[in-house]
Design a protein with these regions (language model features):
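Cell-wall polysaccharide-cleaving catalytic domain and substrate-binding groove, primarily
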Residues: 1-191
């Protein structure tokens, strides 16, 4: 429900996208919806919300095993997987390590990550979700620091928080969200 309709923003590395499903994903899945022998922008335009939902459930939730994580973590990790692929798992694994878990940061969810997430969740409670959401926000800032074209996703045209930052902060408690002044200070070097 979060993802919007068709967009083909040249600054978005995902390329043509509809309901959050990128042309790259559709090509990987062989979704030639117009049956013309290739997967192109026309196929992206034909994607239905129901098809997108099925893709997300199968390939973004079940296949990477996000459904095996503690229930409190599933929404934020799933949302980030839709937005950033396996980088979301690396962020999670790094956060778990910050809580003392001894796991490999490899971008793959497996028994070590599941057990570490369960143990840390039991100890840290809601703070694990907050810590993950903060790390996610920092990931977006770091992307925008390195790639000027990505800044419009972190900062809107009026200079306030952009979609990426709002998206990350939706999953954290209010006390961990940046104030407008903190946000302005963080992005001030972007000019």
């Amino acid at each position: 429900a979060r993802e919007g309709g068709f967009i083909d923003d040249p600054d978005d590395r995902g390329g043509a996208t509809k309901f959050g499903v990128t042309i790259h994903t559709m090509r990987n899945l062989g979704l030639d919806l117009d049956r013309d022998g290739d997967v192109d922008v026309a196929d992206v335009r034909l994607l239905t919300r129901a098809q997108a939902t099925n893709i997300f459930m199968k390939h973004y939730f079940k296949q990477p095993h996000i459904d095996h994580l503690p229930a409190a973590l599933q929404p934020v990790v799933f949302d980030m997987y839709v937005n950033a692929g396996s980088n979301d798992v690396k962020i999670l694994q790094s956060v778990l390590r910050e809580f003392g878990a001894i796991i490999t940061v490899d971008g793959c969810l497996g028994p070590q990550s599941f057990e570490a997430a369960k143990i840390v969740q039991e100890k840290a409670k809601d703070f694990l979700v907050d810590a993950y959401a903060i790390a996610r926000r920092n990931y977006y800032f770091n992307l925008a620091d390195r790639r000027v074209a990505s800044r419009k996703f972190a900062r809107n045209r009026a200079g306030g928080k952009g979609g990426w930052i709002h998206r990350a902060e939706e999953f954290m408690q209010e006390k961990y969200r940046m104030t407008d002044a903190e946000f302005q200070m963080r992005v001030s070097k972007w000019a």
